[in-house]
């Protein structure tokens, strides 16, 4: 008996569901990253992330007065440095950001 999709399909289904349920979030194209559409670039962004499979962390905390953006890696894997940089560049034009991103070995 199979209870879940393959992890690739499961992540894509999650992204599609988030986009439909939370129009205040903008997906970063090509990766599992979300930005608060109302983020004001005059402020230093707070960006958090970790591995997929712990939803709604971290995208569930993106919004006014909370996270500016989130980045999620593959299933039970932290996001890559390249993914973190991509989300940062899409979030702000400032040369600074505050990060809370978990780094751990793959499960």
PLM region spans:
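Glycine-rich oxoanion-binding loops at beta->alpha junctions
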Residues: 54, 58-94
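Phenylalanine-focused residue identity feature
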Residues: 32-34, 39, 61, 76, ...
């Amino acid at each position: 008996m199979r209870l879940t999709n393959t992890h690739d399909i499961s992540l894509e289904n999650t992204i599609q569901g988030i986009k439909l349920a939370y129009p205040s979030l903008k997906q970063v194209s090509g990766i599992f990253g979300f930005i608060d559409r109302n983020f004001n670039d005059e402020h230093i962004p707070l960006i958090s992330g970790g591995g997929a499979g712990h939803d709604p962390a971290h995208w569930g905390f993106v919004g006014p007065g909370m996270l500016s953006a989130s980045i999620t890696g593959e299933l039970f894997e932290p996001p890559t440095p390249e993914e973190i940089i991509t989300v940062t560049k899409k979030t702000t034009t400032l040369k600074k950001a505050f990060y809370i991103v978990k780094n751990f070995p793959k499960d």
